[in-house]
Amino acid sequence: MIGRRTVLAGGLSLPSAAEAQSPWKGYYAKGTRQRPVRFAADDGTMLAGTLLLPAWSELQRVPGFVLVAGSGPTDRNGNNPLVPARIDTLRLIAERLAEAGFGTLRYDKRGIGASTQMPSALADQERFTAWDQFVGDVRAAHAELLKHDEIKRYATGLLGHSEGGLLVLAAAPTISQNKPHVMVLAATPGRPYGEILRRQLQRAAPTLIDGVERALGAIRNNGRPPAGLPAELQPLFPAYIGPFLQGAMAFDPAAALATSPLGCLLLHGGADQQIVPMNDIQPLIDALGNRGAGGEAMVAAGVSHNLKAVTGPNDPGFTGPLAPAIADKLATWSRAALGA
Protein backbone atom coordinates (compact mmCIF):
# COMPACT_ATOMS: atom_id res chain seq x y z
CA MET A 1 0.00 0.00 0.00
CA ILE A 2 1.16 3.54 -0.72
CA GLY A 3 2.10 5.18 2.55
CA ARG A 4 0.60 8.47 3.69
CA ARG A 5 3.02 11.37 3.90
CA THR A 6 3.26 15.05 3.10
CA VAL A 7 6.34 16.20 1.20
CA LEU A 8 7.54 19.80 1.10
CA ALA A 9 9.69 20.50 -1.93
CA GLY A 10 12.56 21.75 0.16
CA GLY A 11 12.91 18.30 1.68
CA LEU A 12 12.19 16.26 -1.41
CA SER A 13 14.42 13.28 -2.07
CA LEU A 14 14.94 13.18 -5.81
CA PRO A 15 14.51 9.81 -7.51
CA SER A 16 17.57 7.87 -8.54
CA ALA A 17 18.42 7.49 -12.20
CA ALA A 18 17.04 3.96 -12.10
CA GLU A 19 13.74 5.17 -10.64
CA ALA A 20 13.48 8.07 -13.05
CA GLN A 21 13.42 5.99 -16.21
CA SER A 22 10.77 3.63 -17.47
CA PRO A 23 11.59 -0.07 -16.97
CA TRP A 24 11.14 -0.55 -20.72
CA LYS A 25 13.45 2.21 -21.95
CA GLY A 26 16.43 0.62 -23.61
CA TYR A 27 14.36 -2.41 -24.58
CA TYR A 28 11.48 -0.89 -26.56
CA ALA A 29 11.28 2.03 -28.97
CA LYS A 30 11.40 5.48 -27.44
CA GLY A 31 8.96 8.25 -28.26
CA THR A 32 5.20 8.49 -28.34
CA ARG A 33 2.19 7.69 -30.48
CA GLN A 34 -0.79 10.03 -30.69
CA ARG A 35 -4.37 9.24 -31.66
CA PRO A 36 -7.37 11.58 -32.02
CA VAL A 37 -10.50 10.40 -30.21
CA ARG A 38 -14.16 11.38 -30.19
CA PHE A 39 -16.66 9.98 -27.71
CA ALA A 40 -20.18 10.67 -26.53
CA ALA A 41 -21.07 12.05 -23.11
CA ASP A 42 -24.17 10.96 -21.21
CA ASP A 43 -26.35 13.56 -22.96
CA GLY A 44 -24.99 12.81 -26.44
CA THR A 45 -22.53 15.70 -26.49
CA MET A 46 -19.48 14.73 -28.54
CA LEU A 47 -16.16 15.31 -26.82
CA ALA A 48 -12.93 15.49 -28.81
CA GLY A 49 -9.57 14.61 -27.39
CA THR A 50 -6.12 13.12 -27.76
CA LEU A 51 -4.82 9.73 -26.66
CA LEU A 52 -1.06 9.90 -26.11
CA LEU A 53 0.79 6.60 -25.72
CA PRO A 54 4.39 5.53 -25.17
CA ALA A 55 5.76 4.01 -28.37
CA TRP A 56 6.26 0.65 -26.66
CA SER A 57 2.52 0.35 -26.01
CA GLU A 58 2.39 -1.43 -29.39
CA LEU A 59 4.08 -4.36 -27.63
CA GLN A 60 3.14 -3.94 -23.97
CA ARG A 61 -0.07 -2.63 -22.44
CA VAL A 62 0.42 0.42 -20.25
CA PRO A 63 -1.45 2.07 -17.37
CA GLY A 64 -3.52 5.10 -18.29
CA PHE A 65 -4.83 8.39 -16.96
CA VAL A 66 -7.71 10.65 -17.93
CA LEU A 67 -6.61 14.30 -17.70
CA VAL A 68 -9.33 16.81 -16.75
CA ALA A 69 -8.94 20.54 -17.43
CA GLY A 70 -9.62 23.37 -15.02
CA SER A 71 -12.18 26.17 -15.05
CA GLY A 72 -13.22 28.44 -17.89
CA PRO A 73 -12.88 27.83 -21.64
CA THR A 74 -9.89 25.53 -21.21
CA ASP A 75 -8.98 23.06 -23.94
CA ARG A 76 -7.41 19.61 -23.83
CA ASN A 77 -3.89 21.08 -23.60
CA GLY A 78 -4.70 23.40 -20.70
CA ASN A 79 -4.88 26.59 -22.76
CA ASN A 80 -7.47 29.29 -22.25
CA PRO A 81 -8.18 32.08 -24.79
CA LEU A 82 -8.65 34.52 -21.89
CA VAL A 83 -4.97 34.09 -20.96
CA PRO A 84 -2.52 35.75 -23.39
CA ALA A 85 0.04 32.94 -23.18
CA ARG A 86 0.36 29.28 -24.09
CA ILE A 87 0.13 27.40 -20.82
CA ASP A 88 -0.01 23.78 -22.07
CA THR A 89 -0.07 22.30 -18.56
CA LEU A 90 -2.13 19.25 -19.56
CA ARG A 91 -0.10 18.63 -22.70
CA LEU A 92 3.11 18.76 -20.66
CA ILE A 93 1.64 16.40 -18.06
CA ALA A 94 0.64 13.97 -20.82
CA GLU A 95 4.14 14.05 -22.29
CA ARG A 96 5.81 13.52 -18.91
CA LEU A 97 3.53 10.60 -18.13
CA ALA A 98 4.22 9.08 -21.56
CA GLU A 99 7.95 9.23 -20.80
CA ALA A 100 7.22 7.40 -17.54
CA GLY A 101 5.23 4.65 -19.28
CA PHE A 102 1.62 5.87 -19.12
CA GLY A 103 -1.03 6.49 -21.71
CA THR A 104 -3.24 9.54 -21.26
CA LEU A 105 -6.54 10.75 -22.65
CA ARG A 106 -7.13 14.49 -22.50
CA TYR A 107 -10.16 16.18 -24.02
CA ASP A 108 -11.68 19.54 -24.90
CA LYS A 109 -14.39 20.43 -22.42
CA ARG A 110 -17.94 20.61 -23.72
CA GLY A 111 -18.42 23.87 -25.61
CA ILE A 112 -14.66 24.22 -26.19
CA GLY A 113 -12.33 23.46 -29.09
CA ALA A 114 -13.41 20.54 -31.27
CA SER A 115 -16.07 19.31 -28.83
CA THR A 116 -19.78 20.07 -29.33
CA GLN A 117 -20.33 23.81 -29.05
CA MET A 118 -22.66 25.65 -26.70
CA PRO A 119 -26.34 25.77 -27.78
CA SER A 120 -27.97 29.16 -28.31
CA ALA A 121 -31.12 28.99 -26.14
CA LEU A 122 -30.68 29.85 -22.45
CA ALA A 123 -32.53 26.78 -21.16
CA ASP A 124 -30.38 24.54 -23.36
CA GLN A 125 -27.24 26.33 -22.18
CA GLU A 126 -28.20 25.72 -18.55
CA ARG A 127 -28.64 22.00 -19.21
CA PHE A 128 -25.49 21.80 -21.33
CA THR A 129 -23.26 23.39 -18.67
CA ALA A 130 -24.78 21.88 -15.52
CA TRP A 131 -22.34 20.54 -12.93
CA ASP A 132 -23.54 16.96 -13.37
CA GLN A 133 -22.82 17.12 -17.10
CA PHE A 134 -19.16 17.92 -16.49
CA VAL A 135 -18.96 15.16 -13.89
CA GLY A 136 -20.46 12.76 -16.42
CA ASP A 137 -17.89 13.83 -19.02
CA VAL A 138 -15.09 12.55 -16.76
CA ARG A 139 -16.92 9.24 -16.49
CA ALA A 140 -17.34 9.07 -20.28
CA ALA A 141 -13.66 9.89 -20.83
CA HIS A 142 -12.61 7.06 -18.52
CA ALA A 143 -14.86 4.65 -20.40
CA GLU A 144 -13.28 5.82 -23.67
CA LEU A 145 -9.77 5.32 -22.29
CA LEU A 146 -10.59 1.70 -21.50
CA LYS A 147 -11.71 1.02 -25.07
CA HIS A 148 -8.15 1.29 -26.35
CA ASP A 149 -6.27 -2.00 -26.42
CA GLU A 150 -2.99 -0.43 -25.32
CA ILE A 151 -4.39 0.45 -21.87
CA LYS A 152 -4.34 -1.89 -18.88
CA ARG A 153 -7.95 -2.01 -17.74
CA TYR A 154 -6.90 -2.76 -14.16
CA ALA A 155 -4.43 0.15 -13.87
CA THR A 156 -6.06 3.50 -14.57
CA GLY A 157 -6.34 6.84 -12.82
CA LEU A 158 -7.95 10.26 -13.02
CA LEU A 159 -5.92 13.47 -12.92
CA GLY A 160 -7.62 16.83 -12.54
CA HIS A 161 -6.08 20.29 -12.59
CA SER A 162 -7.70 23.01 -10.47
CA GLU A 163 -11.49 22.75 -10.97
CA GLY A 164 -10.77 19.55 -12.87
CA GLY A 165 -9.73 18.01 -9.57
CA LEU A 166 -13.18 18.73 -8.14
CA LEU A 167 -14.72 16.97 -11.13
CA VAL A 168 -12.40 13.99 -10.58
CA LEU A 169 -13.44 13.77 -6.92
CA ALA A 170 -17.11 13.94 -7.88
CA ALA A 171 -16.85 11.49 -10.79
CA ALA A 172 -14.68 8.77 -9.26
CA PRO A 173 -17.34 7.19 -6.99
CA THR A 174 -19.89 7.20 -9.84
CA ILE A 175 -17.78 4.89 -12.04
CA SER A 176 -19.27 1.50 -11.25
CA GLN A 177 -17.45 -0.76 -13.73
CA ASN A 178 -13.71 -0.98 -14.35
CA LYS A 179 -13.14 1.61 -11.67
CA PRO A 180 -10.06 3.84 -11.63
CA HIS A 181 -7.47 2.90 -9.05
CA VAL A 182 -5.87 6.25 -8.23
CA MET A 183 -6.40 9.96 -8.62
CA VAL A 184 -4.10 12.96 -8.82
CA LEU A 185 -5.44 16.34 -7.68
CA ALA A 186 -3.22 19.13 -9.00
CA ALA A 187 -3.75 22.69 -7.72
CA THR A 188 -7.21 21.60 -6.57
CA PRO A 189 -9.07 23.57 -3.88
CA GLY A 190 -9.90 21.86 -0.62
CA ARG A 191 -12.88 24.06 0.17
CA PRO A 192 -16.32 24.30 -1.48
CA TYR A 193 -16.53 26.32 -4.68
CA GLY A 194 -18.37 29.27 -3.17
CA GLU A 195 -15.76 29.72 -0.44
CA ILE A 196 -12.92 29.67 -2.95
CA LEU A 197 -14.67 32.17 -5.22
CA ARG A 198 -15.22 34.53 -2.28
CA ARG A 199 -11.58 34.24 -1.21
CA GLN A 200 -10.30 34.90 -4.73
CA LEU A 201 -12.48 37.99 -5.16
CA GLN A 202 -11.66 39.24 -1.67
CA ARG A 203 -7.98 39.20 -2.60
CA ALA A 204 -8.32 40.52 -6.16
CA ALA A 205 -11.29 42.91 -6.00
CA PRO A 206 -12.57 43.45 -2.44
CA THR A 207 -14.95 46.21 -3.54
CA LEU A 208 -16.94 43.63 -5.51
CA ILE A 209 -17.49 41.19 -2.66
CA ASP A 210 -21.03 42.40 -1.91
CA GLY A 211 -22.01 41.67 -5.50
CA VAL A 212 -20.43 38.23 -5.27
CA GLU A 213 -22.42 37.44 -2.13
CA ARG A 214 -25.62 38.58 -3.81
CA ALA A 215 -24.92 36.47 -6.89
CA LEU A 216 -24.05 33.34 -4.92
CA GLY A 217 -27.11 33.73 -2.69
CA ALA A 218 -29.45 34.10 -5.65
CA ILE A 219 -27.95 31.10 -7.43
CA ARG A 220 -28.15 28.98 -4.30
CA ASN A 221 -31.79 29.92 -3.71
CA ASN A 222 -33.31 30.00 -7.19
CA GLY A 223 -30.66 28.76 -9.62
CA ARG A 224 -30.14 32.01 -11.53
CA PRO A 225 -27.73 34.94 -11.13
CA PRO A 226 -29.51 38.17 -10.22
CA ALA A 227 -30.03 41.14 -12.50
CA GLY A 228 -28.02 44.31 -12.04
CA LEU A 229 -24.64 42.83 -11.12
CA PRO A 230 -21.64 45.12 -11.61
CA ALA A 231 -20.19 44.86 -15.11
CA GLU A 232 -16.97 43.41 -13.71
CA LEU A 233 -18.86 40.41 -12.31
CA GLN A 234 -21.01 39.61 -15.32
CA PRO A 235 -18.33 37.44 -17.02
CA LEU A 236 -18.13 35.39 -13.80
CA PHE A 237 -21.89 34.98 -13.58
CA PRO A 238 -23.32 34.59 -17.11
CA ALA A 239 -27.04 33.89 -17.33
CA TYR A 240 -26.59 30.13 -17.86
CA ILE A 241 -24.19 29.49 -14.95
CA GLY A 242 -26.78 28.81 -12.22
CA PRO A 243 -27.11 24.99 -12.49
CA PHE A 244 -23.34 24.60 -12.66
CA LEU A 245 -22.68 26.74 -9.60
CA GLN A 246 -25.50 25.17 -7.62
CA GLY A 247 -23.89 21.77 -8.05
CA ALA A 248 -20.36 23.03 -7.52
CA MET A 249 -21.23 24.92 -4.33
CA ALA A 250 -22.97 21.88 -2.87
CA PHE A 251 -19.87 19.71 -3.38
CA ASP A 252 -17.36 19.41 -0.52
CA PRO A 253 -14.02 18.21 -1.92
CA ALA A 254 -12.46 17.38 1.45
CA ALA A 255 -15.45 15.25 2.46
CA ALA A 256 -15.31 13.46 -0.90
CA LEU A 257 -11.60 12.70 -0.49
CA ALA A 258 -12.07 11.53 3.09
CA THR A 259 -14.41 8.75 1.95
CA SER A 260 -12.62 7.79 -1.27
CA PRO A 261 -10.91 4.39 -1.39
CA LEU A 262 -8.54 5.49 -4.17
CA GLY A 263 -4.87 6.17 -3.71
CA CYS A 264 -4.36 9.90 -4.11
CA LEU A 265 -1.54 12.31 -4.88
CA LEU A 266 -2.01 16.00 -4.08
CA LEU A 267 0.25 18.34 -6.07
CA HIS A 268 0.36 22.05 -5.29
CA GLY A 269 2.56 25.00 -6.01
CA GLY A 270 3.79 27.05 -3.10
CA ALA A 271 3.48 30.21 -5.23
CA ASP A 272 -0.08 29.48 -6.40
CA GLN A 273 -1.95 32.79 -6.47
CA GLN A 274 -5.38 31.23 -7.13
CA ILE A 275 -5.54 28.25 -4.75
CA VAL A 276 -3.38 29.67 -2.01
CA PRO A 277 -1.35 27.40 0.25
CA MET A 278 -1.90 26.43 2.85
CA ASN A 279 -5.35 27.81 3.66
CA ASP A 280 -7.12 26.77 0.46
CA ILE A 281 -5.59 23.28 0.35
CA GLN A 282 -5.24 22.26 4.01
CA PRO A 283 -8.65 20.53 4.14
CA LEU A 284 -7.51 18.12 1.41
CA ILE A 285 -4.25 17.40 3.21
CA ASP A 286 -6.15 16.76 6.44
CA ALA A 287 -8.60 14.46 4.67
CA LEU A 288 -5.75 12.55 3.03
CA GLY A 289 -4.07 11.93 6.35
CA ASN A 290 -7.21 10.82 8.17
CA ARG A 291 -8.36 8.06 5.83
CA GLY A 292 -7.35 4.47 5.30
CA ALA A 293 -6.40 4.66 1.62
CA GLY A 294 -2.85 5.57 0.70
CA GLY A 295 -1.60 8.84 -0.67
CA GLU A 296 0.88 11.68 -0.56
CA ALA A 297 0.78 15.46 -0.68
CA MET A 298 3.43 17.73 -2.13
CA VAL A 299 3.64 21.52 -1.95
CA ALA A 300 6.50 22.62 -4.21
CA ALA A 301 8.16 25.93 -3.35
CA GLY A 302 8.29 28.55 -6.10
CA VAL A 303 5.68 26.83 -8.29
CA SER A 304 2.59 28.45 -9.78
CA HIS A 305 -1.04 27.40 -10.12
CA ASN A 306 -0.12 25.99 -13.54
CA LEU A 307 2.68 23.91 -12.00
CA LYS A 308 5.47 26.03 -13.53
CA ALA A 309 8.48 27.52 -11.75
CA VAL A 310 8.15 31.26 -11.06
CA THR A 311 10.90 33.86 -11.03
CA GLY A 312 9.34 36.12 -8.39
CA PRO A 313 6.11 37.29 -6.75
CA ASN A 314 4.90 39.07 -9.89
CA ASP A 315 5.46 36.11 -12.22
CA PRO A 316 2.11 34.33 -12.86
CA GLY A 317 3.91 31.17 -13.92
CA PHE A 318 2.01 30.66 -17.16
CA THR A 319 4.80 29.57 -19.49
CA GLY A 320 7.71 27.14 -19.51
CA PRO A 321 8.06 23.46 -18.64
CA LEU A 322 6.52 21.74 -15.65
CA ALA A 323 8.46 22.40 -12.48
CA PRO A 324 10.93 19.50 -12.14
CA ALA A 325 9.86 18.67 -8.59
CA ILE A 326 6.22 18.38 -9.72
CA ALA A 327 7.02 16.38 -12.86
CA ASP A 328 9.28 13.95 -11.03
CA LYS A 329 6.89 13.37 -8.14
CA LEU A 330 4.01 12.76 -10.55
CA ALA A 331 6.02 10.18 -12.50
CA THR A 332 7.50 8.30 -9.55
CA TRP A 333 4.31 8.23 -7.50
CA SER A 334 2.20 7.12 -10.45
CA ARG A 335 4.66 4.36 -11.30
CA ALA A 336 4.59 3.08 -7.72
CA ALA A 337 0.80 3.31 -7.55
CA LEU A 338 -0.05 1.71 -10.90
CA GLY A 339 2.97 -0.45 -11.56
CA ALA A 340 4.24 1.08 -14.80
Predicted features, each with a name:
Residues 274-279:
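Conserved alpha/beta-hydrolase "acid-adjacent" motif
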Residues 126-147:
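Alpha/beta-hydrolase active-site loop
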Residues 176, 182-259:
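Accessory cap/linker subdomain of secreted extracellular hydrolases
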Residues 266-268:
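Short beta-strand/loop motif that positions the catalytic acidic residue
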Residues 23-57:
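N-terminal cap/lid segment of alpha/beta-hydrolase-fold proteins
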Residues 1-12:
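N-terminal secretory signal peptides and thylakoid transit peptides that target proteins
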Residues 144-148, 154-200:
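Primarily recognizes the serine-hydrolase "nucleophile elbow" in alpha/beta-hydrolase
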Residues 58-60, 65-96:
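Short, surface-exposed "cap/lid" segments of acyl-processing enzymes
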